[in-house]
Swiss-Prot record:
InterPro entries per the UniProt record, alphabetical: Snake_3FTx, Snake_toxin-like_sf, Toxin_cobra-type
Subcellular location: Secreted
Subunit structure: Monomer.
Organism: Spilotes sulphureus (Amazon puffing snake)
Similarity comment: family membership: Belongs to the three-finger toxin family. Ancestral subfamily. Boigatoxin sub-subfamily.
Signal peptide: 1-21
Protein name as annotated: Sulmotoxin 2
Cystine pairings recorded for this chain: C24-C47, C27-C35, C41-C62, C66-C77, C78-C83
Function noted in UniProt: Probable neurotoxin. Is not toxic to mice and geckos.
Length: 86
């Protein structure tokens, strides 16, 4: 019984991070160059960066699911606070 209780405590401790919303940088194609402060996202969202192929802009934000890249774009999703800084 003690072993089960200890195992549950360890699992709960490891999952604590997933209970809190992430802080993600959020900016669009017009404001990407001054995206300097992370904002709180909804619980369960992940951070993302959407890059165009020639490096002229980057869209940053948070979403329930990772966005789909369009032609000449690429997407990077991440799962810890402020992970979409660069």
């Amino acid at each position: 019984m003690k072993t089960l209780l200890l195992a549950l405590a360890v699992v709960a401790f490891m999952c604590l991070d997933s209970v809190y919303p992430l802080n993600c940088f959020q900016c669009n194609r017009e404001t990407w160059w001054k995206c300097s402060e992370a904002k709180r996202c909804r619980l369960g969202n992940k951070c993302y960066n959407l890059y165009n192929s020639d490096g002229k802009w980057t869209v940053k934000g948070c979403a329930q699911t990772c966005p789909t890249a369009g032609p000449d774009e690429r997407v990077k999703c991440c799962y810890i606070s402020e992970c979409n800084r660069y």
